[in-house]
């Protein structure tokens, strides 16, 4: 994190703050610097500017307490990909998109769907590595808290399956009210060993905003093509909202196997292929 000109100060006592900074490889003395911070003033939680030039111990501790970093706002919406988030961040903070992508790949095995859609207040001067680790730490805590609240413990394999399903729901549903219905169709088709045949699974990575055509359905041989292969895609296809996660975990109990977009921009659901064909005509 040494290339960052900012540092994050967590909530907590002075002792807890110093312990956190030591864990982040800052050269602080837990007893001596705790006493000095009592004299200088307790750091407020948030981002602080520390500059990249060498600082005396006293200057560093003073900055922790008094030098708030300027922030910029970045909004990451559900249904987007990390590539689009990192493009946005690179432009706003004059950072390297390639470095952001590389730091992400180095830090986590999760290809997509892990970072949390949210409005982030990010400090000017942060490095690519520091920023990626901040986003991942925030995401890890969020997913773990949500899963443990529902199931009592975190099971990574089960969580990954739910996030994959949630990402399909995020792409397919016209609104939050439909999410549990779309979820039911996914589970019902999986249970019957049917192909999902959903366009949203083909909106992965670079194809996030590309219209799905019959030619693409025929020619895309990736495991994301649920017209070609049974089962779920290997990874989530986009970021997911809390509502999509809950819909993936708690699908509505229906017998629906099909849905099609109607004139109102929402979807009409059906149990049989014959009814589905009629809905397509309408």
Predicted regions: what is each one?
Residues 1-197, 201-207, 212, 238-243, ...:
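Conserved catalytic or metal-liganding residues and their short signature motifs at active sites
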Residues 213-249:
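C-terminal amphipathic alpha-helical segment
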């Amino acid at each position: 994190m040494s290339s960052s000109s900012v540092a994050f100060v967590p909530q907590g006592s002075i002792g807890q703050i110093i312990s956190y900074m030591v864990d982040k490889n800052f050269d602080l003395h837990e007893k001596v610097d705790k006493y000095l911070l009592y004299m200088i003033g307790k750091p407020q939680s948030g981002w602080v500017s520390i500059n990249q030039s060498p600082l005396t111990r006293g200057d560093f501790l003073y900055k922790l307490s008094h030098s708030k970093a300027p922030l910029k706002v970045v909004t990451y919406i559900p249904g987007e990909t990390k590539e689009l988030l990192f493009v946005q961040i690179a432009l706003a903070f004059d950072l390297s998109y390639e470095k952001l992508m590389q730091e992400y790949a180095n830090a986590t095995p999760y290809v997509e769907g892990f970072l949390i859609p949210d409005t982030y207040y990010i400090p000017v001067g942060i490095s690519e590595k520091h920023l990626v680790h901040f986003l991942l730490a925030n995401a890890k805590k969020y997913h773990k808290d949500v899963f443990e609240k529902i199931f009592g413990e975190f099971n990574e394999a089960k969580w990954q399956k739910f996030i994959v399903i949630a990402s399909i729901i995020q792409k397919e549903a016209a609104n939050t009210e439909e999410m549990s219905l779309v979820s039911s169709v996914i589970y019902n088709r999986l249970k019957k060993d049917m192909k999902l045949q959903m366009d949203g699974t083909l909106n992965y990575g670079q194809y996030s905003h590309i219209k799905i055509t019959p030619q693409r359905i025929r020619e895309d041989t990736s495991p994301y093509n649920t017209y070609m292969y049974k089962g779920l895609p290997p990874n989530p296809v986009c970021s997911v909202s809390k509502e999509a996660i809950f819909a993936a975990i708690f699908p509505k109990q229906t017998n629906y196997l099909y849905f099609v977009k109607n004139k109102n921009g929402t979807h009409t659901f059906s149990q049989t292929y014959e009814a589905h064909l009629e809905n397509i005509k309408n």
